[in-house]
């Protein structure tokens, strides 16, 4: 661990070649490890813990008052809390863990749905602390974690709002279109 108090690993996919779903997960974790955590580590900012492949010192556990992370995405909750506390999570590309990924679309959908619910929980519980840490303490890591967490939430909420708005517009314009249709039919019948 080179003296680091918290270290995350390279998360690899055990069943990468099973099908397109497992390969997709493998590519997702390559992106997360090599294109997010490696540059974060290079810049000496905090990385994100993902899954079970991480370690932390007893000092960290004592400082946070024991393991108090029980949301659906406890790894992200742990990351957000440490970032708010100004703790750095390092990345070790040589520490490789192998995860078995879902092989069916339904399994993947269930897991992704759980992750989205977990993101919402983390934003609700830790989002304010991340914003405060970013603005008051000037922590880039807090901004980084917000940008990795909030977009999923924002996109979900925005798509919900757009769907409701389009439904309302559809209901209003459909009535107008029906009035135009019946007026045209009536005028055609009279003439």
Stretches with model-predicted labels:
Residues 43-44, 103-191:
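Basic/Trp-rich segment in TM-proximal cytosolic loops or flexible interdomain/linker regions
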């Amino acid at each position: 661990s080179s003296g680091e108090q918290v270290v995350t690993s390279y998360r690899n996919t055990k069943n990468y070649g099973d099908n397109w779903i497992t390969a997709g997960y493998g590519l997702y974790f390559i992106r997360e490890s090599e294109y997010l955590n490696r540059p974060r580590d290079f810049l000496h900012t905090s990385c994100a813990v993902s899954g079970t492949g991480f370690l932390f010192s007893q000092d960290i556990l004592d400082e946070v008052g024991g393991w108090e992370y029980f949301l659906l995405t406890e790894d992200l909750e742990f990351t957000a809390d440490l970032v708010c506390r100004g703790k750095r999570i390092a990345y070790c590309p040589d520490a490789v863990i192998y995860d078995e990924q879902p092989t069916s679309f339904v399994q993947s959908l269930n897991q992704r749905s759980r992750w989205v619910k977990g993101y919402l929980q983390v934003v609700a519980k830790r989002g304010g602390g991340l914003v405060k840490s970013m603005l008051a303490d000037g922590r880039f890591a807090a901004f980084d974690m917000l940008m990795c967490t909030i977009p999923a939430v924002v996109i979900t909420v925005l798509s919900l709002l757009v769907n409701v708005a389009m439904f309302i517009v559809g209901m209003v314009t459909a009535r107008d279109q029906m009035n135009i249709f019946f007026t045209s039919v009536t005028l055609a019948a009279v003439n």
